[in-house]
């Protein structure tokens, strides 16, 4: 592979805690010009304030180690498992709450979804990026943080995992209760439901874009930050729209229950909100001092 060329498979999205190999699979070579630049750590020297008495400014070096390549098949497998876990537990909580007379409470519903998101990000983020959400995948592709060629496969796997999780719930909690389906409350107009889903999706993607694509954000806390955003959104929007923020959170349970009421809201509003939230963060984020552009493929970083 020539220096500067693009590898056949995109680099795995970065996630807290897992270092990558320093050299390519062929191993290091002896001569100093033979190392592949893609496999070498990237160093950036940042100026620090001058030390009193020394009269010179000091510098510190930040080393970025590239993540190893992950095949698309492995990414899709991890994305399927992660989305399945999210939909199963985020949908199970309101079903249990309905079946057992409020045993979990609205806060429990929100916390269950937030914990599921945090768990999946920390366990699969280093493999697939833990998108779990077609709106997120589309927004990242639109902002050049994810390759468009992989979007159809990711969205298809997310939708399939959602349907599988919903039918698994239907088998566990037979008959499938309406509590797991996200539909607008009878007291909420169509416009209000649409705007609510737009706003909470905006909030979610603003946070996700910050912790997943900005090198100055604390990537090690990505799962906690995103899980907290999901919990907050469901606490606010749960009573009115169910707090979906995710087309496949609504799609799978709708198919299992045969309830497609106002489904278009949950397909369109989260996607538009995600695009807006990610775009706004990109507009307000601090620019790199060396003028570097965003990497082609980023998600929850190591």
Curated annotation (Swiss-Prot):
Chain ranges for the short sequence motif NPA 1 as given in the UniProt record: 133-135
InterPro entries recorded: Aquaporin-like, Aquaporin_transptr, MIP, MIP_CS
Source organism, top-level taxon: Eukaryota
Alphabetized PANTHER family for the sequence: AQUAPORIN NIP2-1, AQUAPORIN NIP5-1-RELATED
Entry annotated with the keyword S-adenosyl-L-methionine: no
Keyword Transferase included in the entry's annotation: no
Source taxonomy: Eukaryota, Viridiplantae, Streptophyta, Embryophyta, Tracheophyta
Record-given protein name: Aquaporin NIP3-1
Gene: NIP3-1
Membrane topology: Multi-pass membrane protein
Region annotated Disordered, chain positions: 1-31
Alphabetic keyword roster: Membrane, Repeat, Transmembrane, Transmembrane helix, Transport
Gene Ontology CC: lateral plasma membrane
UniProt xrefs under SUPFAM superfamilies: Aquaporin-like (SSF81338)
């Amino acid at each position: 592979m020539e220096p500067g060329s693009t590898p056949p498979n995109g680099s795995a999205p970065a996630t807290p805690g897992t270092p990558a190999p320093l050299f390519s699979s062929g191993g290091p070579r002896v001569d100093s010009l033979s190392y592949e630049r893609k496999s070498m750590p990237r160093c950036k020297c940042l100026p620090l304030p001058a030390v009193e008495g020394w009269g010179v400014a000091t510098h510190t070096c930040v080393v970025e180690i590239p993540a190893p390549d992950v095949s698309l098949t492995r990414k899709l497998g991890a994305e399927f498992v992660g989305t399945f876990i999210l939909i199963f537990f985020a949908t199970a909580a309101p079903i249990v709450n309905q079946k057992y007379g409020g045993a979990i409470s609205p806060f429990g519903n929100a916390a269950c979804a937030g914990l599921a998101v945090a768990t999946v990000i920390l366990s699969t983020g280093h493999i697939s990026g833990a998108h779990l959400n077609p709106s997120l995948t589309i927004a990242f592709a639109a902002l050049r943080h994810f390759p468009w060629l992989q979007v159809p496969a990711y969205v298809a796997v997310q939708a399939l995992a959602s349907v599988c999780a919903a039918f698994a719930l239907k088998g566990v909690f037979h008959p499938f209760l309406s509590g797991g389906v996200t539909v607008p409350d009878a007291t909420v107009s169509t416009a209000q439901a649409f705007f609510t889903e737009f706003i909470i999706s905006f909030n979610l993607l603003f946070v996700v874009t910050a912790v997943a694509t900005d090198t100055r954000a604390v990537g090690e806390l990505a799962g906690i930050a995103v899980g907290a955003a999901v919990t907050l959104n469901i606490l606010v929007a749960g009573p009115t729209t169910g707090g979906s923020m995710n087309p496949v959170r609504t799609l799978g349970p709708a198919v299992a229950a045969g309830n497609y009421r106002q489904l278009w809201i949950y397909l369109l509003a989260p996607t538009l909100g995600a695009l807006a939230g990610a775009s706004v963060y990109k507009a307000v984020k601090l620019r790199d001092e060396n003028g570097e552009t965003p990497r082609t493929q980023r998600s929850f970083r190591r």
